[in-house]
Regions:
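Short beta-strand/loop motif that positions the catalytic acidic residue
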Residues: 186-188
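Conserved HGGG/HGGXW glycine-rich cap/lid loop of the alpha/beta-hydrolase fold
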Residues: 16-62
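Catalytic histidine-centered segment of alpha/beta-hydrolase-like enzymes
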Residues: 214-224
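Conserved alpha/beta-hydrolase catalytic His-Asp/Glu region
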Residues: 130-170
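Gly/Ala-rich beta-loop-alpha elbow adjacent to hydrolase catalytic centers
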Residues: 78-82, 86
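Flexible "cap/lid" loop of the alpha/beta hydrolase fold
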Residues: 97-127
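Conserved alpha/beta-hydrolase "acid-adjacent" motif
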Residues: 193-199
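Acidic beta-to-alpha connecting loop that harbors the catalytic carboxylate
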Residues: 190-192, 214-215
């Protein structure tokens, strides 16, 4: 592996994984908080004049902000559970954030009305195995074509790693980890069966939002602008 790109990706460190997929000494950065169970393979964003860093694995929510000290502008994107993770970790970071966009997620990740139903979340933990994960991923993608796209970029993490991440998220959310972080815009998919569309609409009533004809998982390049 190229150490200049992968220096932040160290499995043995108890910290949120932060992985540069593009690091070319640009002055602007796309900081993307991806969803549960994902890793650096989940998405590939290559925007001109921007470096790209992918955040994932919220088993530990500690965040190393010093890696971003040389950037003049940071565009934050959160997808799915990454919306909550970004909200919590960035609220006191004092980074030069230019804009923030939430995609198919909310700041209330485990909540019946504005997030994922707590009963469904618990069942996901209790029943998690290879078969149930496959079912979840198909539901997340919504169509055969989208699923085929997803599996080309799917996570290489173990089932046990994914389960521990869910348990940790559940524990942290129960502590009422509220945030003062402000999102500029929410993007809401009409075919999202993970964070139900109606729940997202309830969660984002007070900010600008865009409704799109997409499933929970999508081609993120279309919405990184």
């Amino acid at each position: 592996r190229n150490k200049s790109i992968n220096i932040l990706y160290q499995e043995f460190i108890k910290i949120m994984k932060q992985y540069f997929t593009k690091q070319e000494n640009n002055k602007s950065l796309i900081l993307f908080f991806t969803g549960w169970g994902m890793d650096q393979n989940t998405l590939s964003i290559n925007k001109k004049d921007f470096d790209t860093c992918i955040c994932f694995d919220y088993t530990d929510i500690d965040f190393e902000k010093s890696h971003y000290k040389n950037y003049q502008a940071i565009d934050v994107y959160g997808w799915s559970m990454g919306v909550w993770a970004a909200s919590y970790t960035l609220q006191n970071c004092n980074l030069p954030i230019r804009k923030s966009v939430a995609i198919n997620g909310t700041i209330f990740p485990i909540e019946k009305e504005r997030g994922i139903d707590p009963i469904i979340f618990q069942k996901t933990i209790d029943l998690l195995n290879e078969q149930s994960l496959l079912k979840f991923n198909k539901r997340m993608c919504g169509s055969k074509e989208n699923f085929q796209f997803f599996i080309k970029h799917s996570s290489l993490r173990s089932i046990e790693s994914l389960k521990q991440e869910l348990i940790s998220i559940q524990s942290m959310v129960k502590k009422d980890m509220t945030s003062t972080f402000q999102w500029d815009k929410a993007i809401i998919g009409t075919r999202d069966f993970i964070f139900p569309t109606k729940n997202q609409l309830k969660a984002w009533r007070k900010i600008k939002y865009e409704i799109i004809d997409e499933a929970h998982f999508l081609d993120f390049n279309k919405y990184v602008d």
